[in-house]
């Protein structure tokens, strides 16, 4: 099933990074990134901020502002003031040669008298004009402007991206987030606005931030292979979690109790990327919910493994946690989608969506769902996303994904991927990947391809994200973000 690209945004971001050890170039904040992600540093930063702010009478005409006090966003400013009557706050950042950036400041109520927020969007090595506007319930407003000259970025990433192709469609007011470059040098999370201008540079310890999740106005994100940070709306780190002997890999979600469920590698094992763990965000306790070897023991034993190397026999790369305590996993190594029931209490295999030929002669053929229609089952897929739809029957739902359309299994050298006509088997010669959307019917045990379109080839990683709700692809009223 091939369809024209239509209402799709494809970002191919190639950012050359030549970054130093990880010391802020701005003289106001010369601290190592490792130190930032300690509670000692954050508590001292909060104390310094409160002491500097003191008990001053801060109004719209006398705003207290401090550049990046918690060192978590090099393009940010802490802002505090009061208005004589309840107001909502917006701000605009202007700098010569760059489009303006306007945002609404966070506050607990739409209109209130006390205003404390993190302003983002400053342009480095530039005198920024910051305009803050208070709008009152009666529709009247007041504005003030001030200038701030920001120093350099910590990294050497592009401030302004070049648009190589695309339509003139309005993209709305949002930020596109790159969750980490996984480089040998300093790693970052970048946020670009719809004009392709960098508005947030967030240093992390290393690896990448796989997701940004929000709970109770707190942002949770991984900042290294073993650590998670909980960051409030001011940019202050409120909590740092250590995952012990587990490495976070690719994905995490909140469960129904507000705790975090991770895909992980247990460093005490000889295999990788095959565990699911839970982090209790209150007690900090880390527990293992599932080792996939327990459910796929005979399959693992049938795979190839070079002594002394890590055994990447399953390589799970996506986690979707459902309200009934089941999880949907994407396995790159088997090019399969796997649903596990009761992951927190008594895990069991529900179904597998994958090539029947790949799973034949194993103990797991009974779990395979039946393909309905003539299409190529996904290969090496990523970001498999669960999507409900009120128009569907109970037991039916959609799964959409970035289908890499790449057939390769390092631990299954006995399997010839070329038997699947159309699948790419060469990293350098591959031509086409896809956006795929399946209709899954648990009542019938089937899956059907209901939507797809071609995208540039990417053998590994990459992602697809629909913006616009459950119906968006079906009714063509949303944007799909493809990140290669």
For each feature predicted by the language model, list its residue ranges:
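Membrane-proximal envelope biogenesis segments
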Residues: 14-18, 24-25, 47, 129
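Solvent-exposed serine/threonine-rich low-complexity stretches and specific carbohydrate-binding patches
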Residues: 99-110
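Membrane-interface motif at the C-terminal end of an N-terminal transmembrane signal
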Residues: 18-36
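N-terminal Sec-pathway targeting helices
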Residues: 1-13
């Amino acid at each position: 099933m091939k369809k024209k690209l239509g209402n799709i945004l494809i970002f191919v971001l190639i950012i050359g990074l030549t970054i130093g050890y990880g010391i802020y170039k701005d003289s106001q904040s010369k601290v190592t990134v490792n130190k930032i992600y300690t509670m000692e540093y954050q508590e001292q930063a909060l104390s310094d901020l409160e002491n500097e702010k003191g008990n001053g009478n801060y109004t719209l005409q006398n705003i207290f502002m401090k550049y990046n006090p918690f060192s978590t966003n090099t393009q940010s400013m802490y802002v505090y003031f009061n208005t004589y009557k309840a107001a909502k706050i917006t701000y605009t950042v202007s700098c010569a040669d760059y489009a303006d950036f306007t945002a609404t400041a966070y506050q607990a109520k739409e209109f209130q008298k006390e205003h404390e927020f993190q302003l983002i969007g400053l342009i480095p090595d530039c005198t920024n004009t910051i305009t803050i506007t208070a709008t009152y319930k009666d529709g009247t407003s007041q504005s003030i402007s001030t200038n701030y000259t920001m120093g350099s970025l910590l990294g050497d990433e592009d401030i302004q991206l070049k648009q190589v192709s695309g339509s003139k469609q309005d993209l709305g007011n949002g930020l596109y987030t790159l969750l980490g470059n996984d480089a040998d040098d300093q790693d970052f999370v970048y946020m670009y606005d719809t004009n392709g201008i960098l508005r947030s540079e967030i240093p992390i310890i290393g690896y990448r931030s796989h997701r940004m999740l929000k709970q109770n106005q707190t942002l949770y994100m991984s900042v290294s292979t073993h650590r998670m940070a909980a960051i409030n709306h001011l940019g202050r780190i409120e909590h740092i979690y250590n995952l012990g002997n587990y490495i976070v890999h690719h994905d995490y979600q909140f469960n129904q109790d507000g705790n975090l469920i991770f895909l992980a590698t247990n460093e005490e094992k000889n295999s990788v990327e095959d565990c699911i763990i839970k982090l209790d965000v209150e007690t900090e306790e880390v527990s293992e919910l599932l080792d996939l070897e327990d459910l796929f023991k005979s399959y693992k034993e049938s795979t190839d493994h070079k002594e002394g190397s890590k055994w990447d026999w399953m390589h799970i790369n996506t986690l979707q946690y459902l309200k009934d305590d089941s999880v949907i996993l994407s396995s790159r190594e088997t090019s399969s989608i796997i649903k596990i029931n009761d992951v927190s209490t008594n895990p069991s295999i529900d179904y597998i969506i994958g090539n029947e030929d790949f799973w034949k002669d194993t103990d797991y053929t009974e779990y395979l769902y039946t393909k309905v229609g003539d299409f190529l089952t996904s290969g090496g897929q990523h970001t498999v996303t669960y999507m409900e739809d009120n128009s569907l029957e109970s037991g039916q739902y959609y799964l959409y994904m970035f289908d890499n359309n790449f057939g390769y299994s390092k631990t299954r050298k006995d399997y010839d991927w070329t038997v699947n006509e159309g699948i790419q088997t060469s990293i350098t010669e591959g031509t086409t990947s896809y956006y795929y959307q399946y209709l899954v019917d648990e009542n019938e045990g089937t899956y059907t391809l209901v939507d797809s379109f071609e995208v540039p080839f990417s053998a590994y990683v990459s992602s697809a994200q629909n913006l616009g709700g459950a119906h968006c692809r079906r009714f063509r009223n949303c944007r799909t973000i493809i990140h290669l």
